[in-house]
Each structure stands twice: as structure tokens, then as C-alpha cells.
Amino acid sequence: MKKFVSLFSIVLVLTMLLSACTPAVTPTEETETQVPTAEEIKLVVWDQFYRDVESGVMDTLNTEFEAAHPGVKIERVVKTLDDLKVTLKLALSESTGPDVAQVNQGRSDMGAMVQADLLLPLNDYSTQYKWGDRFSTSVASRNSFTPDGKTFGEGNLYGVSPTAEVVGVYYNKGIFDANGWTIPATFDEFEDLLAKIKAKGITPISFGSLDGWNAIHEFSAVQHILVSLDYINNFVYGVNNATFDTPENQQAAAVMQDWVAKDYFSPDFSGVGYDDSNKLFKTGEGAMTITGSWLAGELIGDTDQQFGFFLLPANPDHT
């Protein structure tokens, strides 16, 4: 069984390996002027940065890391999120699995791997390298479980998030400017804008739900302006009797149904994949799209379109 650590604990692993693998040298006439060379270390790293821009960033970071740590070679394996979820747990149970990998947060992935004793706790490294000064408690909690994997949000630290991301609304600046539209200040203004965009014969929200996972972003963007942060945390961690069956969640679902009925999403969106819908948006098909800040790199290159970003606004009374 092979335990592994998350993406941003690479430095710690390599520090230990380099010190362990450097042979002792007894000075002699021949060796006093020679620098001992550590045995080459291969570090197998799995990540899900498969899109062009972010993949290029990872390649650059890996190259810089290797240059800073002579004798260390990173064998990078790139997978989609779906592939990673399907293959990672089995791979970690074998000696040939990755040394470092990204793990989807939450009970079904990280929690299950903690229960299976596949992940290495990082508490000591967090203390030694003062990660608490760099990462907020809320970010650390999302990567923490009790050793039995049953309690989410407390206990041992099992990973460090490579990014802190938000879900919001990207908009096509050219389309907005050509029609005199501005960023809405309230949710009512946002829905008025959707109607105006539709009336112009433009798809208001570029969206494809074929992959399944990304549909929660459309819902949660609305949900988050209706509920409190305490509710979100209680629900995520499964504490204080938090339930999904609330008036606010029902209201958010009703908004989704209303947008579908009014054709505010891309035509036949249930048959369009996430990446394909983003490509359409990038080429000017659709005035807006609701997704995460991770897409920014893909939108700023290889296109003549200009894009902006804003968080979905709430009404003053959060209704």
C-alpha cells in the first residue's frame, strides 16, 4: 500500500529524500575537490491541470523545481477530473502509484482515501513550514479529516489547496459594450439583463451540463446569495443538523427551472460538454457563462474576444 501527499508538499518530500539519498563522503586527495552527487530521485506526480494554459504553467513550475533541486526528476501524469476520480484510489493502493497527486476534497474522495489509510498526514510539515501563516483556517479545514476519515473539517491535514477559487459570472465585454449593458448591482438587475440579452437574440448564459459535475455551479451561484456562510459550512461538514431541504435551496432550484423555461441557457445544453461550452463562449457564442476562476487562463489567450468577471449579486434583502 502506498501513501502519498498532495501537490504542494513536494518540497517537503524532496527535502527528506535528498538528505536521505546523499552518500557520506570521506575526504581524500581525490575526493576533497569533488562534489558528491545524490542518486537521482523520480517523483511521480498526478495532476488535473489538463487545459492548455494551466498545463503550461505546471510544466514551467516543475522545470523550475527540478532546477532548484538537482537530481530530482518529476514524472508528470495529467488526467481529467473524471479520470482522476476513477483511477486514483486504486493506483494509491499499489506500489507503482503516484507519490504526489491532487485529490478532490470531500467525503467521497479525500475522506474515502483517509479511511483506506492511503494519505499521509501533513500536520508536522504545516507546523515546520508555517503553512498556517499562508493559508486560512477555512482553506485548511477543507483539507482536513479525523484519522478514521469520518469527520470532515477537523483532525489531520491531508493536503494543501493549489488554488483558492471562486465561482462567478464571466461576460463578453464586446457584446456588453455594443449593447450598452453594464454589470448588474442586484439579482433583480441580473435577471432583467438576462431578459434583455435574450430579446436581442443572444444566448444569455453559455452552458453545457453533459458532464454533470459543473451544473452545481449554476445552482450554487444562486444558492450562495440566499443562504448564510454558517449554513454552507454546516452543510459541507455535515454538522448541526444541516439539511439540503430548505426554502432557500428550493428557491434556487426554482430559479434554475425558470431560466431553463425562458431559454436563458445554451440550446440543447444537456448534450453539450463543459469544455465545449467554454470553447463556444470563447468564440463569442453567448454573452455570459457561470463557472470558476480556474477558467481565466483559457479565456485570455488565443482569442480576439475580451472578457470580464463579476460575482453574482444579491438583492439587498437576499431574496
Where are each of the predicted segments found?
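Short, solvent-exposed loop/beta-turn-alpha elements that line the ligand-binding surface or hinge
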Residues: 123-138, 226-251, 301-302, 314-319
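Short helix-initiation/N-cap motifs at beta->coil->alpha
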Residues: 78-87, 187-192, 268-282
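Short helices/loops that flank or line small-molecule/ion binding pockets
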Residues: 85-96, 116, 175-176, 195-199, ...
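Glycine-centered hinge/linker elements that transmit conformational signals in sensory
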Residues: 192-197, 237-269
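Hinge/lid segment of periplasmic solute-binding proteins
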Residues: 107-167, 191, 218-220, 308
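Conserved N-terminal structural module of periplasmic/extracytoplasmic solute-binding proteins
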Residues: 6, 21-118, 128, 133-134, ...
